[in-house]
Amino acid sequence: RSSDLENGELGEVYLAKAHAVRRRGIPTWGVFLNEAEQGGGALIDIGTHALDMTLWIMNNYKPKRVSGSVYKKLGKGDTAGNAFGPWDNEHITVEDSAFGYITMENGATVFLEASWALNTTDTREQKVTLCGTRAGADMNDGVCINSVCSGELAETRPLLRQTGVPGEDLAKNEADFEAEMWLDALDTGKPTLVRPEQAMVVTQILEAIYESARTGKEVEL
């Protein structure tokens, strides 16, 4: 979690956007395209990661109500240009895109966009945008903090995980950090970065988006 957020440099974060958008990136393996076996498409595949990261960065796991839309528009169409090659467009039964609007108990809004296939060039996956009362942050090209400084609009880019010591920067990849975290939790009893109850909230929100799309109504949590 960024020190800029933990230190309150963004102020009150009242809007967040969770991005998981591919132009053409429909999986072609496993049971990804089978709703009966997979449970859903782009939303539970890549949308879940973007939402999980957004709630964790905000440190806000108290949703109040959810509305959403789910679409099966491009999955049955032309498979040209897909990052993973042609998919089975005759038997796909899951959504290719989904969008959720989440209102938190403190009034903050989270907008979630998830797609395997969408006619857009604005493609961002596992990215988060935050808008606060003092500053904003996005991950379009690394982490960028936008604010007003000395009467002018300003942008700063924190040097994350850089020590200034040659050979020490990024010495461990994400998989190494994750493995060490789990081993440390097992050995010492320390809590992991993401708690089971937090993961449950993510699942509740995803289910609420599907329910809202089915019923056409807002879902209270």
Question: Which role does the model predict for each range below?
Answer:
Residues 1-92, 216:
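Predominantly a Rossmann-like dinucleotide-binding segment in NAD(P)-dependent oxidoreductases
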Residues 52-147, 176-191:
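Contiguous beta-strand/loop segments that form the cofactor/metal-binding neighborhood of enzyme cores
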Residues 156-170:
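C-terminal "lid/loop" region of Rossmann-like NAD(P)-dependent oxidoreductases
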Residues 12, 93-96, 195-201:
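An acidic site on a long C-lobe helix of protein kinase domains
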Residues 38-45, 88, 166-174, 194-197:
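Short, surface-exposed alpha-helical recognition segments that flank or form part
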Residues 105-106, 139, 181-221:
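C-terminal helix-rich "cap/oligomerization" subdomain common to oxidoreductases
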